[in-house]
A protein has these predicted regions:
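Short N-terminal edge-element motif at the start of the domain
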Residues: 2-46, 51-52
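Calycin-type beta-barrel ligand-binding domains and close structural analogs
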Residues: 5, 15, 19-25, 51-146
């Protein structure tokens, strides 16, 4: 059965935040907002910290739909994630391909899970010497609908 881009977008396009996680572990997780929406032919996202209200990342994306996966392309960086259905068939798992590097030569590792109520994201950036530049947190950010 082909993967459903309509269901993927239905699950993804919401206003999300990690308020509960930030309240439970304030020394580990900042309170972050992460919004996704479709405008015209493009998928957009923006992120900001609750304390400042200033957007620190805004991106435009496009999807390439295949029979068994969705390729989420990040237009600004040229990087992408491959989403497949999870084992339950009621959600999605997205990962950067192995050996993904950004324009600065930093190895990027991202794992995202998505279902009708939860979006989790774990990102790690590693330099050529194996030093972790980001992603030292104890687990993924866990976002819920706002």
């Amino acid at each position: 059965m082909a993967i459903s881009s309509a269901l993927f977008l239905e699950y993804l396009c919401h206003n999300w935040d990690n308020l509960k996680q930030a309240q439970q572990w304030p020394n580990e997780f900042a309170h972050v907002h992460y919004d996704w929406w479709v405008e015209g032919a493009h998928l957009h996202s923006k992120q900001w910290y609750d304390w400042s209200g200033e957007v620190y990342r805004e991106r435009t994306h496009h999807l390439d739909i295949q029979d068994n996966h969705i390729k989420l392309n990040i237009n600004e960086s040229g990087l992408h994630l491959i989403f497949t259905e999870d084992e339950t068939g009621h959600g999605f798992i997205g990962k950067t391909p192995p050996d993904t590097y950004n324009e600065k030569g930093i190895k990027i590792e991202t794992v995202i899970t998505l279902d009708c109520a939860t979006y989790t994201s774990f990102d790690k950036g590693t330099d050529k010497d194996g030093n972790i530049l980001w992603g030292k947190i104890p687990g993924p950010f866990i976002f819920k609908h706002t």
